[in-house]
Amino acid sequence: MPEYKAPLRDMRFLIDHVFDFHSSYAALGASDASPDMVAAILEEGAKFCENVLAPLNRSGDEEGCHFDNGVVTTPKGFKQAFAQYVEGGWHGLAADPSYGGQGLPHSLGLVISEMVGSSNTSWGMYPGLTHGAMSAIHAHGSEEQKQTYLSKLTAGQWTGTMCLTEAHCGTDLGIIKTRAVPQADGSYAVSGSKIFISAGEHDMSENIIHLVLAKLPDAPAGTKGISLFIVPKFLPNADGEAGERNAVSCGSIEHKMGIKASATCVLNFDGAKGFLIGEANKGLNCMFTMMNHARLGTGMQGLCLGEASFQGAIKYANDRLQMRSLTGPKAPDKAADPIIVHPDVRRMLLTMKAFNEGNRALAYFTAQLLDVAHLAADETQRQDAENLLAFLTPICKAFMTETGLEVTNHGMQVFGGHGFIREWGMEQLVRDCRIAPIYEGTNGIQALDLLGRKVLGSQGKLLMGFTKIVHKFCAANAEHLQLKGHVAQLNGLNQQWGALTTKVGMAAMKNPDEVGAAALDYLMYSGYIILAYLWLRMALVAQARLDAGEEDADYCQAKLATCEFYFKRLLPRTASHQAAIEAGSDCLMKLPAELFAF
């Protein structure tokens, strides 16, 4: 298994120099997050993830979760690691101080979540789902519900889930069958079965708080008739502690390709006592708070597993000796040269590096917007951040997982045949990553959300909010001595982006299938442009530090070289995505369903 080391240098480069989190924190009134405190948190977070979580990654995959008559036991060491995580204060790092949290910015919490996910993705899903449940209750719960649940969730005594999917419906939640019948005491009797519930049952906390989508008896049809309910595993008693067992049980756990140490459960609700959160029939709006949190978290999984894969691949490429360089021996005192000298191996490694570092920049850029949306005093500033988040969230989820899967595949390929062998650990990263483009809304659904709802649905407003940022950036740096060629390339694509969007929108007015046909290519096209913008932001800082004679010259040179690789070898993929978009829907829809197979 690759030995994980938190990429603190790259993290600090983004935090300190590219995005200047510290100035942002000061402007948002989050002065408690001082540079010294942030540095200490990063160091301690790295130690915990490297020394506690990473050693459990392979063993957790080998052992998996155990199911026995409704009881789920997590792999050896998981429960103890969670206790250490909670004791160290990590669980409430960015949570509201009113409920026992430390109140630090969301962006700092996201940096720690990257370390957690890279060191042990399966383990990280348990606290990750809880943070999502906390966000939904905090945003939509009554004061009584907040007082009852948030302190326990923040403290890590209780954990949370979200329960959406049923056997007959995943994407189409409007046809769920789970029902909630009003009771005389104001509660609801929730009945039905949910599947694919991550962390639905386990032994890591005293109680599990399920957020469940269900329909009231008189609910309107479709998604406008969905309500959200808090359904605890153990009902809180008068003292606020876990009391009587509720009528919710785990029927089984799934046997999966990857993330085997994360318990994926079938949950049965047999008249379980539930409590309405938010307004009746407005549950999907409430759940979207948690779903958007989960979608950003899922996008992070692409980055996290890609980082772990790159660390294994770069070490192997420097150690593995095979053949001689085409330009002559590079290690003449050895039997062969290390494979890192070969162009095709470098192609894979640089692709991994460019996507990982670009995706990290995208994640931190998005996290900084989360800070603004939550903390800014100015309403206009908050709304602008919310609009950008709405636009970026489906891109973060889908682009980062598509490229993350590509990165883990490259990592396994660098190892050759050894990558296919379990003991090296590279194939586990591929298996763990494969679910990321599927759950929390498939990437096809994310693409429809982006193009249909966010871009065309806003009449282009959300897209223009971002393209204006890029346009301003390009105008300011058009004459940059070393980078003006890349700036011009980005500027051209940014202008083309709007024109291409208009073309798709016009075609969709005549044929709605045009949106579905173009959506995924449109999302990937958008992702490549966004990463180009972020790579140039990193390159500008790196070049400025080189010009100033800063001590990190080698690191900055590497940044500039990787930026050049991205612009020359990866950004041109936009051309193929554009061609596919412009090809339209006819070639997809003309073949009758009965002729797909004979």
Roles of regions detected by a PLM:
Residues 1-124, 148, 579-580, 586-598:
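Amphipathic, small/basic residue-rich leader segments at the start of a protein or domain
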Residues 30-32, 62-74, 286-293, 297, ...:
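Glycine-rich cofactor-pocket loops
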Residues 131-133, 142-145, 440-442, 450-494:
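A structural-propensity feature for long, helix-poor, extended segments
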Residues 187, 191-241, 245:
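A short core secondary-structure module
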Residues 196-198, 235-251, 256, 263-294, ...:
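A glycine-rich, basic-preceded beta-loop-alpha segment at the flavin cofactor/substrate interface
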